[in-house]
């Protein structure tokens, strides 16, 4: 199947916006800068995306789709949960570009209700991935916490770690992750 006309230009703009979001942040992005980075005409940003904000939303959505697919495959793997947990925690280091994009758009959404609604949908997609991953584990390990509460705990824990790491703060992270791993290991052994 052939790509639709303009697909390569559109992808180049998305790639450029992704790089700029990571390197310069949302405040450093202009239509002209994205177009220049993509080797394209700045009018194409508006043609394909309507606005710079919509371009940034598409960057987030494209990145999110890739990572959610990866997470679902990882959580669906036939390996002990502790191995899946370790892999997920390694992703905290590997996914810093996505994390920066996520927090850049979160900060933009504080004053843009339409963007806030979209980010709430993305948040819901991530929560669904965690619900699917943790429901059988919670029951098997006898974790007496409502599933919604467990997922919220894990999600906000991850966001806190990500935000601190983006700020250059890693104090206590290694120790906390080791403690959680030991706790999970003890739960696994007790089953």
Go through the PLM ranges and name each one:
Residues 1-8, 191:
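N-terminal intrinsically disordered/low-complexity leader segments
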Residues 87-93, 100-112, 183:
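Helix-loop "lid/cap" segments that line or gate small-molecule binding pockets
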Residues 39, 50-54, 76-79, 93, ...:
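Residues in soluble alpha-helical coiled-coils and helical-bundle/repeat scaffolds
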Residues 58, 69-99, 147-154:
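Hydrophobic alpha-helical connector segments
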Residues 61-66:
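Short, basic, alpha-helical segments at the C-terminal edge of helix-turn-helix-like DNA-binding modules
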Residues 9-12, 16-54, 58:
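Helix-turn-helix
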Residues 68, 73, 94-103, 113-139, ...:
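Amphipathic alpha-helical packing segments from all-alpha helical-bundle domains
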Residues 116-120, 137-191:
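Hydrophobic/aromatic-rich alpha-helical bundle segments in the mid-to-C-terminal region
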């Amino acid at each position: 199947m052939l790509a639709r006309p303009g697909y390569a230009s559109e992808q180049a703009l998305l790639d450029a916006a992704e790089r700029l979001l990571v390197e310069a942040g949302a405040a450093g992005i202009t239509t002209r800068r994205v177009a220049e980075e993509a080797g394209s005409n700045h009018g194409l940003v508006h043609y394909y995306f309507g606005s710079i904000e919509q371009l940034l939303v598409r960057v987030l959505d494209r990145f999110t789709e890739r990572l959610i697919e990866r997470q679902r495959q990882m959580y669906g793997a036939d390996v002990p949960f502790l191995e899946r947990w370790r892999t997920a925690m390694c992703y905290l280091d590997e996914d810093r570009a996505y994390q920066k994009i996520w927090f850049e758009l979160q900060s933009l959404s504080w004053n843009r209700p339409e963007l806030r609604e979209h980010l709430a949908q993305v948040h819901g997609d991530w929560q669904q991935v965690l619900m699917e991953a943790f429901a059988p584990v919670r029951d098997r390990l006898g974790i007496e916490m409502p599933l919604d509460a467990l997922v919220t705990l894990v999600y906000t824990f991850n966001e806190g770690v990500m935000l601190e790491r983006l700020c250059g703060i890693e104090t206590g992270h290694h120790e906390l992750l080791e403690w959680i791993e030991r706790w999970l290991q003890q739960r696994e052994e007790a089953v």
